[in-house]
């Protein structure tokens, strides 16, 4: 049920004609209240798409009534006209829903540098409003796909309240956030401050640590909306855990659907001096193309892990480094460890542990292997 699993939300997903393929390309999510609290986090890319600039302003009020999402065009690097088009999209949604444009967030995904076909998008907003349903969450999730092969949803239900979400993303997966559009809804009765705190805490250890290809999008948006319709105000820790669970689930789905990937790689850094250094080392390992190629070839090449670690400024002694691949400590104290022939890499999941022996901090980064399919898909993608 995705974003409509929580009470107080309706959604729709339609084909507006934005995509030449004729696939669904426009989604609408509406908070019917009584509360309309909202929080959001956005790309840290300095080149921000028009809908990101618009939605950042909308979120300053802490209230969102509706979210319009389109696939088939990013509306990024489109100048003043692109921002005007985003404003017009919000105005159209506000008009048909009877609210203000300042309470309508807008999200776009697709090709950068191309204006959206507003003659199709604006009528599409009206058509989507006419199809809003408490059961429309799945259709909305399908409508925001680009190179995704599957739509991505997650739901967690606790004692009298629910958190549900949908996400898109398959390429340009790297922090801040990953290339993603995410809408998370809850019927827990919470104010904006609690939503913002929980969302930022969750994204820091989930979406911000998904790093498939090291490329950062211009359009990343994660929104958390509360309708308050359950009438239940949960303890903050319980709510934050539920939000983190949904974000983690959606983040794992992003990795499993990454463009061209044949291996999902969990890079776990342990015994680092600080968490920041653990993240730095994990990200450096995850972005090492030589290692990603080795994993694709089912080669437990621990030397490439050590080489990657050595390019960081994290605290460690080279002769104390240990590396395990799928449970086999192939590197011990900076040299040869257990027999690499013991490493079973036939399956999709690959787990790398890098032990820095420098402290007690840990961090995990998720990535993929590098394949010919990834190169083909991104060389064939129009630019």
Swiss-Prot record:
EC number: 2.3.1.35, 2.3.1.1
A GO term, aspect molecular function: glutamate N-acetyltransferase activity
Pfam families: ArgJ
Disulfide bonds: none
InterPro entries xrefs: Arg_biosynth_ArgJ (IPR002813), ArgJ-like_dom_sf (IPR016117), ArgJ_beta_C (IPR042195)
Annotated pathway: Amino-acid biosynthesis; L-arginine biosynthesis; L-ornithine and N-acetyl-L-glutamate from L-glutamate and N(2)-acetyl-L-ornithine (cyclic): step 1/1; Amino-acid biosynthesis; L-arginine biosynthesis; N(2)-acetyl-L-ornithine from L-glutamate: step 1/4
Superkingdom of origin organism: Bacteria
Catalytic reaction(s) noted: N(2)-acetyl-L-ornithine + L-glutamate = N-acetyl-L-glutamate + L-ornithine; L-glutamate + acetyl-CoA = N-acetyl-L-glutamate + CoA + H(+)
Compartments reported by the entry: Cytoplasm
Site (described: Involved in the stabilization of negative charge on the oxyanion by the formation of the oxyanion hole): 109-110
Gene3D superfamilies associated with the record: ArgJ beta chain, C-terminal domain, L-amino peptidase D-ALA esterase/amidase
A single Gene Ontology CC term: cytoplasm
Main location: cytoplasm
Entry keywords, A to Z: Acyltransferase, Amino-acid biosynthesis, Arginine biosynthesis, Autocatalytic cleavage, Cytoplasm, Multifunctional enzyme, Transferase
Gene Ontology process terms (BP): L-arginine biosynthetic process; ornithine biosynthetic process
Cited SUPFAM superfamilies: DmpA/ArgJ-like
UniProt binding sites for substrate: 146, 168, 179, 259, 378, 383
Biological role: Catalyzes two activities which are involved in the cyclic version of arginine biosynthesis: the synthesis of N-acetylglutamate from glutamate and acetyl-CoA as the acetyl donor, and of ornithine by transacetylation between N(2)-acetylornithine and glutamate.
Entry similarity comment: Belongs to the ArgJ family.
Subunit structure, as described in the record: Heterotetramer of two alpha and two beta chains.
Protein name: Arginine biosynthesis bifunctional protein ArgJ
